[in-house]
Amino acid sequence: MSNLFAYSQVRRSRIVRQQQKQIKKAYEEALKEITKSVDKLYGKNDVSSSMRRVYLNKLKDDIQNQMNIVDGKTENIIKDNIGLMAEEVARNTQMYNSKIGLNAIVNSTSLKHRVVTNIITGKVYDGKFTLSSSIWGDNKRRLNEINRIIARDILQNKGVYDIAKDLERFVNPRARKDYDWSKMFPGSRRKIDYNAQRLARTMVSHAYQQAFVESTINNPFISAYKWITSGSNRVCPICIDRESTDQFGLGPGIFPKDRLPLDHPNGMCTFECVMAMNDEEIGEAIADWYLGEGDETMNDMIDRYVNDLKNF
């Protein structure tokens, strides 16, 4: 049988691409409002130090307000896409069941709720961080970077408008920040949306993996999972090792169903099912199950799988 979850893998790539555009758009909308505030400072380079402080504090507040809006949008975008990813895996599972002739209904609503909850609350990360703490923690770091840019520009005796233009460039998601930028403002990010995009990609990928495992862990026709690297030219050593090493005596890259490691941040690896039976054997097992005949242990396993899909 071909890759059972090829459909949801394709959907994951599309969700990630669409999500990237959604987050970029949120930053661009914020930039438009920030630019309005910056334009109001045109011609105000030659003001007293006290007035410079007043203008810059107002601009900083305007920027922070817009970034708060962006972060709120980003949090909602990620939540929505985690849920969408879980729904696509549920749909893929339903397609697979129909293909093998198993009349089992997948409770996509329950699966979606479970996956979204486990990821955004940090349960899947052993409580080390949550979606909200990640986003708003980065919000504080970004504000510190803004403060450092202002402080450095003041040390260079720049005027209000020139400082404002530097801040405008900092929050521009399409601005190119070269080596000179890093030299002028060490420690400030080159891409304003990088951390948000990284977090979003990571959580959608983890939603895919969690939904994949939840919907197959008790499938009696699947014996293990095989790790498949993304195939890009930037595959990390960890993923290469996971794909090529025989850690459990099952073959290179093959993991027991309860031992599949969580993909690392920004990862785009996928997983394939290792089948315990061929198509003909699966068909016979399902027929026996419908008729209440054949292997009782297998029938009990199919019962459990079907019930799990209904009651995630």
Model-derived regions: residue spans:
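Acidic, glycine-rich two-metal-ion catalytic cores of nucleic acid-processing enzymes
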Residues: M184-A285
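N-terminal leader/targeting and assembly helices and adjacent pre-domain segments
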Residues: M1-M184, M277-F312
